Amino acid sequence: MANILRKVIENDKGEIRKLEKIAKKVEAYADEMEALTDQELQAKTPEFKKRYQAGETLEDLLPEAFAVVREASRRVLGLYPYRVQIMGGVVLHNGDVPEMRTGEGKTLTATMPVYLNALAGEGVHVITVNEYLSTRDATEMGEVYSWLGLSVGINLAAKSPAEKREAYLCDITYSTNSEVGFDYLRDNMVVRQEDMVQRPLNFALVDEVDSVLIDEARTPLIVSGAVSSETNQLYVRADMFVKTLKEDDYIIDVPTKTIGLSDLGIDKAESYFNLNNLYDIDNVALTHFIDNALRANYIMLLDIDYVVSEDGEILIVDQFTGRTMEGRRFSDGLHQAIEAKEGVRIQEESKTSASITYQNMFRMYKKLAGMTGTAKTEEEEFREVYNMRIIPIPTNKPVARLDHTDLLYPTLASKFRAVIADVKARHEKGQPVLVGTVAVETSDYISKQLVAAGVPHEVLNAKNHFKEAQIIMNAGQRGAVTIATNMAGRGTDIKLGEGVRELGGLCVIGTERHESRRIDNQLRGRAGRQGDPGESQFYLSLEDDLMRRFGSDRIKAFLDRMRLEEEDAVIKSGMLARQVESAQKRVEGNNYDTRKQVLQYDDVMREQREIIYANRRDVITANRDLGPEIKAMIKRTIKRTVDAHARSNRNDAIDAIVAFARTNIVPEESISAKDLRSLKDDQIKEELYKRALAIYESQISKLHDQEAVLEFQKVLILMIVDNKWTEHIDALDQLRNSVGLRGYAQNNPVVEYQSEGFKMFQDMIGAIEFDVTRTMMKAQIHEQERERVSPNARTTAAQNIAAQSNQSSESSTQDYSHVKRNDLCPCGSGKKFKNCHGRKAF
C-alpha cells in the first residue's frame, strides 16, 4: 500500500514539473505582450486563427495564446493569472480536471484554455450549475473575450429558439448543464433543420465538474408530454390506504431506502380494496400505486427530499446542493403519489419523448474538461467513465486553515446544543461563522435555536436560493452567521471583512458528515481561501443518518467501553475519525457501483439513441429526394412478411400474404390468392414490390413539385420515427424494471437488458418501416394550392394521413385462425401474433 501511495505522489509531482515547464514558456512572453499596444494585442486573435488554419496546432499556439489572455486580463479586469493558474489552464486544455482549492481563481484560469480552443471556430461551451453563475461569468470574463475579438453568448432557459441559436453560434457559449442537455434533446425532436439551435458538440469546460458529472450523473434529463389520465383518484385511494398502516404492516430497508408491504400489510390491502389476491396479474397497476404511496409516505421526507412551494407545487430538493430543482419531477408516478400525500393538486402523468443522462450527454463532446476544488476522491470514476485525469494544482499561498478533530455526541439534542453554544461564542467575539447542514429541516431547526439564543443570522437553503450569492458574499464579514444547506452558494467566494483575519478568519461548522468526503471537503474549503486564516469543526451524533446507516455499531461499542453516560458528554478521537471515513468510503463505493450500473443500462439506450438521432438528422438536413430510402423500407417490409410465412402451409401462407397486401399496400380488390399461388417466394416479393412502386409513384404525382414531395417525405418519416421511438423508450423503461428480478434466477440483469433491448430495437426498426410503408401506400393525398403552410399545419396534415391509414387498416377484418401465438403477425408489423392482432385472442 505504501508503494502504491508513493507511486501516486511521484506521478503527481512529475505532472506538476511538466506543467511548470509549460507555464514558464507562457511567462517568457510576458514582456513581449506588455510592450504591445492594445490594437497590436487584439490583432493577435486573427493572427492565431490564420496560423491554425495554415496547419499549426492549438498546442503550438498555446504558450503565446495563453500569454495574450494573461495580458488582456490585466488590462481589462486588472487581474493577472498566477503561474498555478496557467498550470490549471494547461490541464483544462488537455481535457483533464485541475483540482484547485476554493479561492484559487478557477474562473480566471478558464479564460486561457477557453480562448485557445475558441480559435478553432467550432465553439466552446462553458458549463455552470446555475444561470446566476452563467450570467455572472459570461458578463465578467466576456469582457476579456470581447476585447480580444471573440463573440460570447449566454444560453438561458427563457430564451427563444432564435436567441438560443444565436448564443450557440458564438465563439464561446455560457450555459447550465441542464439547458445544454435539453437543447440537445429538443434539437433531435424538431421537424425542420432551421428549428435546431446547437452546432456539433466540440469542447465543454464544466465548472464544479464533480457536481455535474458525479453527483448528478444518475439524473436523467427527460423531455416528456402529458398523457391524459383518469388515475388521480387511484393515487388518492392508495394514499388513504397507506396512511392507515402501522409499522408492522410494511418493511423498510434503511441502507437501500426501499419499502414493501409485510404479510400483514398485504392482508390489509386485500381487505381494503376487496381483492382475493393483491399480486394477481390483474392488479399490477394497483400494486404500482400502492408501492409509490408507500415510498411517498415513509421514504420521501418533506424538507429533505422535497419542499411544498407557496402555490402548492412539490419541488424536488437536490441532495447535493440543497437547491430546489425547478421544473423537475420524480418519475414513474412517485411525484403524483407525493402530491396525494401532501394534499395538493395532482398533476397529470407524462410520457417520455426523449431522455439522456449527464454521463452520456457530456461524453458526446469531442473534448471535455472540468474544474473543481474537490475531485481526487472520485479519481477512479473520472478516469473510467470520462477518460479524465485529476491533477492537483498547488495553491498560490500555503493553506492556513485549522481543521479541528470531529466531536461526537450521544444524541442529536446534545450535538445541537453544542453547535449553538459554539456559534454564539464565536459571534460574540466577532468571528464570522458558516454553519453547513445536510437538509433544509436542519437549517430551519438551527435557525430557530439561534433566534432563541439571540444570535442574528442569515439562512440559505432550497427555499430562498435566489439571494444565495449576496448572502454568501457577506458571510465573511465581522460577526456574520450564515446557515447553508450543503454547498448552496457554491461558486461564489467568501471574502473576509475588515479585522476578521485577526479573529481567526471564517469558521466553518459542519452539523453532520455527508455521505461523500468530497462534499465535506467542499464545506471545509469555504474557509482559508488564498492563504487566509480559517477554522473548520464538524459536530457528529450517534443519531446522525450516516452513523445510523453505516457506522454506529462499532462506534457504539467503542463508546460503551469509554462508559459514556452523560448526554452532553463529548468524544474527540482519531479512531472515531477513521471509522467515519470508513463509513463514507463504503457509501461512496456503493454510490459509484450504482452509477456504473446506471451507465451500463444507459449505454444500451445511448447506442440506440445515436442511431435514431443520426438517421433523423440525415432526414431533416436532406436536400435530396428521399424516395430511395422509402422504397427500401417498402422492400424490406414486403421481404419480412413473405419470409415470415415461408415455413407455413402454402395455402395459409398465400392467404396471409394477400391479407397483408390488401390491408397495407394495394387496393383491396386488386389482388387475390390466385395471382400469387403459382409464384415462388422471391417472385411474390418482386410482384408485390412492383405493385407497391406503381402506387408510390401515383401517390407522389399528386404533389405539385419536388419541394412539396420532400416536405411530405420528411414529415412522414419523422412523425413515425418519433412516435415509435417514444413507445420504445417506454418499453425499455418497463424492461429495465422487470430484468432486475432475473438476478434471482442467476441471470445477469444487465446482459439480459442488453440482449432484449437489442431485439426490441430491431422490432422497432421493423415497425417504423412497416408504418412508413402502410402510410405511404394507403394515405389519401390531395393536391393543394401552391402556398407555404405553417410547420404546425404540416405536422397536423401528416398526423391526419396516419390516422386515415390506421383507420383503413383496422377496418379490414381478416381471418387469423390459422396463425399460432408465437408466429410473426401476418400484418407485417414485425411483432409476434400474440403481441399484435392476436392480443385479444390470447
Swiss-Prot record:
It is an enzyme of class 7 (translocase). GO terms for cellular component: cell envelope Sec protein transport complex; cytosol; plasma membrane. Its EC number is 7.4.2.8. It comes from the Bacteria. It is a peripheral membrane protein. Transmembrane segments: none annotated. It catalyses: ATP + H2O + cellular proteinSide 1 = ADP + phosphate + cellular proteinSide 2. Keywords: ATP-binding, Cell membrane, Cytoplasm, Membrane, Metal-binding, Nucleotide-binding, Protein transport, Translocase, Translocation, Transport, Zinc. Signal peptide: none annotated. It is found in: Cell membrane; Cytoplasm. GO terms for molecular function: ATP binding; metal ion binding; protein-exporting ATPase activity. One of its GO terms (biological process) is protein import. The keyword Chaperone does not apply. The keyword Nucleotide-binding applies. May bind 1 zinc ion per subunit. Zn(2+) binds at residues 825, 827, 836-837. Its cofactor is Zn(2+). Its main location: membrane. ATP binds at residues 85, 103-107, 493. Part of the Sec protein translocase complex. Interacts with the SecYEG preprotein conducting channel. Has a central role in coupling the hydrolysis of ATP to the transfer of proteins into and across the cell membrane, serving as an ATP-driven molecular motor driving the stepwise translocation of polypeptide chains across the membrane. Belongs to the SecA family. Monomer and homodimer. Part of the essential Sec protein translocation apparatus which comprises SecA, SecYEG and auxiliary proteins SecDF. Other proteins may also be involved. HAMAP family: SecA (MF_01382). This is Protein translocase subunit SecA. It comes from Streptococcus uberis (strain ATCC BAA-854 / 0140J). The lineage of its organism: Bacteria, Bacillati, Bacillota, Bacilli, Lactobacillales.
